Swiss-Prot record:
This is CTP synthase. It comes from Anaplasma phagocytophilum (strain HZ). Residues 296-537 form the Glutamine amidotransferase type-1 domain. Its EC number is 6.3.4.2. Keywords: ATP-binding, Glutamine amidotransferase, Ligase, Magnesium, Metal-binding, Nucleotide-binding, Pyrimidine biosynthesis. It catalyses: UTP + L-glutamine + ATP + H2O = CTP + L-glutamate + ADP + phosphate + 2 H(+); L-glutamine + H2O = L-glutamate + NH4(+); UTP + NH4(+) + ATP = CTP + ADP + phosphate + 2 H(+).
Length: 541
C-alpha cells in the first residue's frame, strides 16, 4: 500500500517491570489496526543482545528463529508482525546490538571514522537511528518494538536512540507506547499499580515520557486506579489502556480497538481516518468458536519445554483448524526421552519439526516408524524429512548404517549429507552459513504434494545445512519412497511421499513461516483435514 502520510510517523513500543509481556503482539496489533484504517505500516524489532542475529541461539532460551524471505534469521516477533499485517519482513527489520557493533567495527577498520574516537555516543547511537529511520517502502507508520525491559543496561543505547529520534523529528511525528505489568496479589485480592509507576519513572529518567501506558493485567482497572497511574506517570487518563490476558491472540486487535488504542494514537498525531474495517479479524474469531471435530497431533521435538520454540508451527496448525472447522489439540512429546517412555497411542497424527544436533534423534526416528507402520498421518519438516529418509533407508530399504553426516561423519551410507558450497574459506563459520530464505521447488506431476499446492512450483523458505544425498535417490525410490519435489537451483530432493500411506509427507522447507490466520497454508490444511478423515475411517473399521 502506498503511503498516505508525509512525513512518516514513528511509534515506539517499550516494556517495563518484567519481560514477555507481549510487546511484540501489541506492536503487531497496532499495525493491524492502522492497516484496517487504510494506512500502510512497517514494523521493526530492536534487540539489545550482542548476537548478530538469533541464528546461533538455542530455541529453548530465545524461542524460535523466524526466517524472512530474504534469508534473515530473526526474532520470533517478526513472525507475529507478518501474520497480523501480511507485510513481508526483511533482515533489515530485526536490528540487534550485535549487528550494530559489527557494522561499527567494520566501518572503523575501513577508516570511516579516521581521526575520531569511536564511542557509544554519537557513533553507536547514530547507527541505530539510521536503522530506525530507514523506510524504503514509504510506510505511513513505522512501528519499532524495543526488546528487553526498561532498566536493563544493554537496552540503554536503543532507548537513547529513540529519544533522539523524537527530539529530531518533533513530538508530533513520534509517540511512545509503554507496556507494563499490573500484578494481582492473591493474598490481598488486589491489583497493584506501583510497579507501573516505578517503570515509567525509570523510563522518564532516560529522557522518555510515555504518551500511552498499556497495562498488562488479568482484569480491567477501576477508574480511580487509572487516574492514579495517570497522575503519577504524567500521562493523560484516556491514554491509560488495558492490555488484558486473552485466550486467543487473535482477539488482541479487536480488544485494543475497543479500548481505543488506535484512536488515541491517531489523536496524538492529529490524523483523521475512517473507522477500521475489522471484518477479517471478526471472521477469525467467529471461526475459532465453530470447531466441531477434534484431532490430536503429537509434535515430537527436543525444545518442547519452551513455549516459544515452535511458535510459527503451532500457529500454522491453529490456522488450519480455523479454516477447516477442526479443533486441533497439540500433544508435546519430548524427543530427549527414550522411545520406550513416550506414548503416541492417543495421537491422530505425528509431526516431526526442524532442529539441529543428534539429541533426541533416536526417539524421533521411532516416532516416524510408528506413523509409517500404523498408517498414521505424518508430516516431517526440515530435519523431520531427513529423519524420514534415514528411517526408511534403515527399516525398509535395508541400507546398513544409513545416517546423516551431521550425526555420524564416518557413516557407511550418508543418505543425508552437508550441502556443498555453504562454507567459504578455511575458517568454519556457523552463523548465517546455511541455505536460508525463499527458493523455488518444482513439484512432480500427479503427486499428492502438487495436488495440495495446486501448482507445479512453490516458493518456500529454507533454513538448513544438510540435505538428502541425491546419490541415494534411485535406490530409495525403487523401494517405494517417492521424491516428488526438487530444488530448482540445484540437485536436491526437497519433498518425499509414501504413495501407499494415507498421508505421509516430508518437506525440506518450512511452510509454517507463510501461514496466516486469514489464509491457512495448504500443506497444514491438508494435513489437518486428512488426519480427521483417517481418524473417522479408522473408527468405522
Amino acid at each position: 500500500m502506498v503511503g498516505k502520510l508525509n512525513p512518516t510517523r514513528f511509534i515506539f513500543v517499550t516494556g517495563g517491570v518484567v519481560s514477555s509481556l507481549g510487546k511484540g503482539l501489541a506492536a503487531a496489533s497496532i499495525g493491524a489496526l492502522l492497516q484496517a484504517r487504510g494506512f500502510s505500516v512497517r514494523l521493526r524489532k530492536l534487540d539489545p543482545y550482542l548476537n548478530v542475529d538469533p541464528g546461533t541461539m538455542s530455541p529453548a532460551q530465545h524461542g524460535e528463529v523466524f526466517v524472512t524471505s530474504d534469508g534473515g534469521e530473526t526474532d520470533l516477533d517478526l513472525g507475529h508482525y507478518e501474520r497480523f499485517t501480511g507485510v513481508m519482513k526483511t533482515r533489515a527489520d530485526n536490528v540487534t546490538a550485535g549487528k550494530i557493533y559489527h557494522e561499527l567495527i567494520v566501518k572503523e577498520r575501513r577508516g570511516d571514522y579516521l581521526g575520531q574516537t569511536v564511542q557509544v555516543i554519537p557513533h553507536v547511537i547514530d547507527l541505530i537511528i539510521s536503522c530506525i529511520l530507514h523506510n524504503d517502502a514509504g510506510a505511513d507508520f513505522v512501528i519499532c518494538e524495543i526488546g528487553g525491559t526498561v532498566g536493563d543496561i544493554e537496552s540503554q543505547p536503543f532507548l537513547e536512540a529513540i529519544r533522539q529520534v523524537s527530539y529530531r523529528l518533533s513530538k508530533n511525528l513520534t509517540i511512545f507506547v509503554h507496556l507494563t505489568l499490573v500484578p494481582y496479589i492473591g493474598a490481598v485480592g488486589e491489583l497493584k499499580t506501583k510497579p507501573t509507576q516505578h517503570s515509567v519513572k525509570e523510563l522518564s529518567s532516560l529522557g522518555i515520557q510515555p504518551d500511552i501506558v498499556l497495562y498488562r493485567s488479568r482484569a480491567q482497572l477501576p477508574q480511580y486506579q487509572c487516574a492514579k497511574i495517570a497522575n503519577f506517570c504524567n500521562v493523560a487518563e484516556d491514554n491509560i489502556i488495558a492490555a488484558l490476558d486473552v485466550s486467543n491472540i487473535y482477539m488482541l486487535p479487536v480488544m485494543y480497538h475497543e479500548h481505543r488504542l488506535d484512536t488515541q494514537i491517531l489523536k496524538h498525531f492529529d490524523v483523521d481516518s475512517p473507522e477500521p474495517d475489522l471484518t477479517q479479524w471478526e471472521n477469525v474469531l467467529r471461526m475459532s468458536e465453530t470447531a466441531s471435530d477434534r484431532i490430536v497431533i503429537a509434535i515430537v521435538g527436543k525444545y518442547v519445554t519452551s513455549l516459544d520454540a515452535y511458535t510459527s508451527l503451532e500457529e500454522a496448525l491453529r490456522h488450519a483448524g480455523l479454516h477447516s472447522g477442526i479443533r486441533v489439540e497439540i500433544k508435546w512429546v519430548d524427543a530427549r526421552l527414550p522411545a520406550s517412555e513416550i506414548d503416541l497411542t492417543d495421537a491422530d497424527a505425528i509431526l516431526i519439526p526442524g532442529g539441529f544436533g543428534d539429541n533426541g534423534i533416536g526417539t524421533k526416528i521411532c516416532a516416524i516408524e510408528y506413523a509409517r507402520v500404523n498408517n498414521i498421518p505424518m508430516l516431517g519438516i526440515c530435519l523431520g524429512m531427513q529423519l524420514a529418509v534415514i528411517e526408511f533407508a534403515l527399516n525398509v530399504a535395508g541400507i546398513e548404517d544409513a545416517n546423516s553426516t551431521e550425526f555420524k561423519s564416518d557413516c557407511k551410507n550418508p543418505v543425508v549429507c552437508e550441502l556443498p558450497g555453504l562454507q567459504v574459506g578455511d575458517e568454519y563459520k556457523m552463523g548465517g552459513s546455511m541455505r536460508l530464505g525463499s527458493y523455488t521447488c518444482n513439484l512432480a506431476p500427479g503427486s499428492r504434494i502438487m495436488s495440495i499446492y495446486d501448482s507445479s512450483t512453490v516458493v518456500e523458505r529454507r533454513r538448513h545445512r544438510y540435505g538428502i544425498n541425491p546419490e541415494y535417490r534411485d535406490v530409495l525410490s525403487k523401494c517405494g519412497l517417492a521424491f516428488t519435489g526438487a530444488a530448482e537451483d540445484r540437485d536436491l530432493p526437497e519433498v518425499l511421499e509414501l504413495p501407499d500411506h494415507p498421508w505421509f509427507i516430508g518437506v525440506q522447507f518450512h511452510p509454517e513461516f507463510q501461514s496466516t490466520p486469514f489464509k491457512s497454508h495448504p500443506l497444514f490444511l491438508s494435513f489437518v483435514t486428512s488426519t480427521l478423515q483417517v481418524k473417522k475411517a479408522s473408527s468405522r473399521s
